[in-house]
């Protein structure tokens, strides 16, 4: 398979793994429980400079992973999920920056989560995995960054749930984060967003194969347990609708029929948009764990760093970040008003914050897709940050 020229790509990348924390230094979770070890999957792109001052941490969204750019092999059909933005000459210019991406705590792509083996039992955690928060996820990222020998990041960047993490970083480690980029996110979920997550979780737990979260088949087990694929697919289909815009759906599908010239007058898949959503659901269950979906959506529900005025003042005191907050005009899952809410909070505390809204028919998913104006703004902000820290010239 032919990929884009290596001058525009980070090329072939190798996933890396590290075990953090330990029996004497466990991870203290916000819920009060402990994890005595956490495995983390991560990837890096570019080179860490001698001063260790050019590191940029990228935080992924709900269903993302550590594979943000490049290819794992020459046979890969697709690059990492943000490949358009990471590489030589791109906004995350790997000729200048050392870019880090890791799989989140609670995930299912190499980092400890519900599908991992519980050392205490030798069995997958399942629903015995402790509840986690965005703060817990960031705590693990912080441990990874320190493990890499980095005392201060150049910037933390994230979209959607990744934007929540970028904000949490600025609050929890104010002296480590001179720049924060928060894209298509919000300072807390609305009741509507919590409702979307609740229905998705119910779809998973109502699947007859959910079995209280115990559906894993261990290596060497002669019996194969059925997984709650129907419930997870339904959760994904519903969520995916919220990631798109009405305009985008209309332009792409309208009322076009799928593989037919006339209505079936039955419950077959008549419309192209039905087929598209079915594909999204069926492909998602091949790469994602249902229990991880439960835990991560709960972490998003719990996120609320500014519950009242007094807490807001306390949390923002000492924060050193320069903020860039970005939104898209057709994103109704995290609409522009939510980004502006965050901007108002930051401005009231006299924090340096720039806000930009971009026009796109792609809805919430626009932050993942090519967009010249968005790309230019993101790249310019990172370049200015790099120049201010390193004294480098463009």
Swiss-Prot record:
InterPro entries linked to this entry: AB_hydrolase_1, AB_hydrolase_fold, HAT_MetX-like
Localization (cell): Cytoplasm
Glycoprotein found in the keyword field: no
Chain residues that bind substrate: 236, 365
Location of the active site: 160 (nucleophile), 331, 364
Stretches assigned to the AB hydrolase-1 domain: 54-368
Keywords per UniProt: Acyltransferase, Amino-acid biosynthesis, Cytoplasm, Methionine biosynthesis, Transferase
Principal location listed in the UniProt entry: cytoplasm
Alphabetical list of Gene3D superfamilies matching this protein: 1.10.1740.110, alpha/beta hydrolase
Marked site: Important for acyl-CoA specificity: 333
E.C. code: 2.3.1.46
Protein name: Homoserine O-succinyltransferase
Native source organism of the sequence: Magnetococcus marinus (strain ATCC BAA-1437 / JCM 17883 / MC-1)
């Amino acid at each position: 398979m032919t990929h884009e020229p290596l001058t525009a790509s980070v090329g072939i990348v190798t996933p890396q793994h590290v075990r953090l924390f330990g029996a004497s230094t466990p991870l203290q979770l916000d819920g009060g429980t402990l994890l005595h070890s956490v495995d983390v999957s991560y990837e890096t792109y570019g080179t860490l400079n001698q001063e260790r001052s050019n590191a940029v941490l990228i935080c992924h969204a709900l269903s993302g992973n550590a594979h943000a750019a490049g290819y794992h092999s020459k046979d890969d059909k697709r690059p990492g999920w943000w490949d358009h933005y990471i590489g030589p000459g791109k906004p995350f210019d790997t000729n200048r920056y050392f870019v880090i991406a890791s799989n989140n705590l609670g995930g299912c792509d190499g980092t400890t989560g519900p599908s991992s083996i519980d050392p205490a039992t030798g069995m997958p955690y399942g629903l015995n995995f402790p509840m986690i928060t965005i703060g817990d996820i960031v705590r693990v990222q912080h441990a990874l960054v320190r493990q890499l020998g980095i005392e201060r990041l150049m910037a933390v960047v994230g979209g959607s749930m990744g934007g929540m993490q970028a904000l949490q970083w600025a609050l929890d480690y104010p002296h480590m984060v001179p720049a924060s980029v928060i894209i298509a996110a919000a300072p807390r979920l609305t009741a509507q967003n919590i409702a979307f997550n609740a229905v998705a979780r119910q779809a998973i737990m109502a699947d007859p194969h959910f079995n209280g979260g115990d559906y894993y088949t261990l290596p060497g087990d002669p019996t194969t347990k059925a997984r709650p694929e129907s419930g997870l697919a339904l959760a994904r289909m519903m969520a995916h609708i919220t990631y798109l815009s009405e305009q985008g759906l209309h332009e792409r599908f309208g009322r076009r029929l799928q593989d037919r010239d006339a209505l079936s007058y039955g419950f077959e898949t008549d419309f192209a948009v039905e087929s598209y959503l079915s594909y999204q659901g069926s492909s998602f269950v091949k790469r994602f764990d249902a229990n991880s979906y439960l835990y991560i959506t709960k972490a998003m529900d719990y996120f609320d760093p500014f519950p009242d005025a007094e807490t807001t003042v306390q949390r923002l005191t000492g924060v050193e970040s320069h903020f860039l907050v970005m939104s898209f005009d057709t994103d109704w899952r995290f609409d522009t008003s939510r980004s502006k809410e965050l901007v108002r909070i930051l401005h009231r505390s006299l924090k340096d914050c720039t806000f930009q809204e971009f026009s796109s028919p792609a809805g919430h998913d626009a932050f993942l897709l090519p967009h010249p104006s968005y790309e230019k703004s993101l790249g310019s902000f990172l370049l200015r940050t790099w120049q201010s820290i390193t004294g480098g010239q463009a």
